[in-house]
């Protein structure tokens, strides 16, 4: 009777389902408990068998911490009520509050935050919102960090933009306030900018979006928060695209500096009709490295091989050949002469072959750059004596070729004077050619070598006796900006007092009327038979103290201080 009673309890609409199956469930191989096929582990708590491991949860991009290179905590937070591509900035900090008690004054530190969304900012100033807004809460719980992008000076120099744009990008990139470009999401980036009323933190958001539809051509859009309700489209007119903002060029330069990013954003890099000109790199024949005859064949082969690789990856052939050429030159042509290795293999009593002792132009130019570094010392004033070098005519021809890079013709000197030397040797009539360089990027391009890049700023620390010593801090080079700022953020360096010297070239202050030149003087045939000339380099440098321009103060200890000796005592012998 019991089976019949159970059958009568089944509803009529379930009577024709047929025999039950095990679809969607499975037995646990350990305890035999039935579990769903999508389960990760056995639901029997005493068993605990794990069937498969779930996918690792990706970090949320609701809030991303920006690398600032300082104690300033800035976050890029998504505005949920506007869409995935709308983001704002949130600043977190610690504020001190004093409380007066009977025992005295107590100073407490409270964590505070400031949201830069206009509505939240207005509500906070009016005192309408008592608690923290949703954007500050997201920033407090943030665990993701932005990815800094590399910016190579070689790509910046090769980019066909105005000199003012290049110099502004270079100044922003070399400031110790974090990397110039940081990647927040797949399409959104954060770019440094000059602090203003609209962008008081000195950062803004940009986005590169590509929309693909089957009916029309792919549409590429660039948005920048420095412009109001405007976007740059790939099919826009030339008048609109001619007004590219400086942040667009900064992002394009960062994309071109990395091979993976260049391939990802190749549509923006290769598109020429939208107003973005191709990044033309100077040919090797016009570059100063071509003066080294031993490098020509190796560099040309490596350049051809690099072009084949780039074309196979469907990238713009004019985008990154300079990187390949320069890297191959570093590996092959621009090595030190083989003299050093051959000398190590020589026996102690073996004579040195004088024909193998040579000095290349690259090695000599590296010594000039090192001499400039030594001269930019914080302990001395910013107007040093001219640096004098006696070099062959061929070396100066190579240097003049570097001075003329970027122009179709050889750059003529700013002034040519003839003078008669009577009070010093050698006597006679000589000609002096003078070049005035007023662009810091061009000075760096002239003096940069793979072994000794020109340092525009130098850091120092002050000793107890008032002297100054060079401070070897983590590198802030633009070439390795991603690695540098990542290391600084993880292991901050203690800097009690920031003392720096900087090379004065161009307009270095807002009220400066005439640009400060970097002067190169050349007097040929000082030694006419040997074809040796005299090269003079004149420059000025300034002093920075905690980020502000400081006047030079001579704090060196006087050299004529009398030595304090212990009084002599009489020693008697028995």
Curated annotation (Swiss-Prot):
The record's listing under InterPro entries reads: C2orf42 (IPR026049), Zf-tcix (IPR029269)
Q: Name one GO cellular component term.
A: nucleoplasm
Q: What is this protein called?
A: Uncharacterized protein C2orf42
Protein species of origin = Homo sapiens
């Amino acid at each position: 009777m019991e089976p019949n009673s159970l059958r009568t309890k089944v509803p009529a609409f379930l009577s024709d389902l047929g025999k039950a199956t095990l679809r969607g469930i499975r037995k646990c191989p350990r305890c035999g408990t039935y579990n769903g096929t999508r389960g990760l582990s056995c639901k029997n708590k005493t068993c605990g068998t794990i069937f498969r491991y779930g996918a690792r949860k990706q970090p949320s991009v609701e809030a991303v911490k920006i690398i600032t290179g300082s104690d300033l905590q800035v976050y890029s937070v998504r505005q949920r009520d506007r869409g995935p591509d709308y983001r704002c900035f949130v600043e977190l900090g610690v504020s001190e509050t004093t409380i007066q008690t009977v025992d005295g004054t107590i100073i407490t530190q409270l964590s505070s935050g400031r949201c830069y969304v206009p509505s939240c900012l207005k509500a906070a100033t009016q005192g309408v919102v008592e608690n923290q807004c949703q954007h500050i809460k997201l920033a407090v719980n943030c665990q993701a960090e932005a990815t800094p992008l590399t910016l190579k000076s070689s790509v910046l120099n090769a980019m066909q933009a105005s000199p003012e744009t290049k110099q502004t990008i270079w100044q922003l990139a070399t400031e110790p306030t974090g990397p110039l470009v940081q990647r927040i999401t797949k399409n959104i980036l954060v770019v440094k900018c000059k602090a203003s009323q609209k962008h008081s933190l000195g950062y803004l958001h940009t986005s590169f979006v590509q929309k693909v539809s089957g009916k029309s051509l792919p549409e590429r859009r660039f948005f920048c928060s420095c412009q109001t309700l405007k976007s740059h489209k790939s099919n826009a007119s030339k008048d609109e695209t001619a007004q590219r903002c400086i942040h667009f060029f900064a992002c394009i330069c960062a994309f071109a500096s990395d091979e993976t990013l260049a391939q990802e954003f190749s549509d923006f890099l290769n598109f020429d009709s939208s107003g973005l000109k191709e990044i033309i790199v100077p040919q090797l024949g016009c570059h100063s490295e071509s003066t080294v005859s031993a490098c020509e064949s190796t560099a040309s082969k490596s350049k051809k091989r690099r072009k084949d690789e780039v074309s196979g990856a469907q990238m713009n052939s004019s985008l990154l050949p300079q990187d390949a050429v320069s890297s191959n030159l570093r590996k092959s042509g621009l090595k030190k002469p083989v003299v050093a290795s051959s000398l190590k293999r020589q026996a102690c009593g073996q004579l040195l072959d004088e024909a193998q002792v040579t000095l290349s132009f690259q090695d000599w130019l590296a010594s000039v750059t090192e001499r400039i570094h030594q001269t930019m010392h914080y302990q001395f004033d910013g107007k040093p004596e001219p640096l004098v070098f006696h070099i062959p005519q061929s070396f100066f021809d190579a240097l003049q070729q570097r001075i003329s890079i970027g122009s179709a013709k050889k750059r003529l000197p700013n002034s040519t004077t003839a003078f008669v030397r009577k009070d010093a040797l050698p006597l006679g009539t000589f000609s002096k050619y003078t070049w005035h360089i007023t662009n810091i990027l061009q000075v760096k391009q002239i003096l940069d070598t793979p072994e000794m890049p020109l340092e525009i700023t130098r850091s120092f620390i002050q000793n107890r006796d008032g002297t100054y010593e060079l401070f070897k801090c983590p590198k802030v080079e633009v070439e390795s900006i991603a690695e540098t700022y990542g290391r600084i953020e993880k292991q901050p360096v203690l800097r009690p007092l920031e003392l720096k010297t900087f090379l004065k070239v161009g307009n270095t202050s807002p009220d400066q009327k005439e640009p400060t030149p970097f002067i190169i003087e050349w007097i040929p045939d000082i030694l006419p038979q040997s074809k040796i000339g005299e090269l003079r380099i004149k420059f000025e440098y300034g002093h920075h103290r905690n980020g502000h321009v400081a006047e030079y103060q001579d704090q060196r200890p006087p050299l004529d201080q009398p030595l304090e000796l212990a009084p002599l005592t009489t020693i008697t012998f028995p």
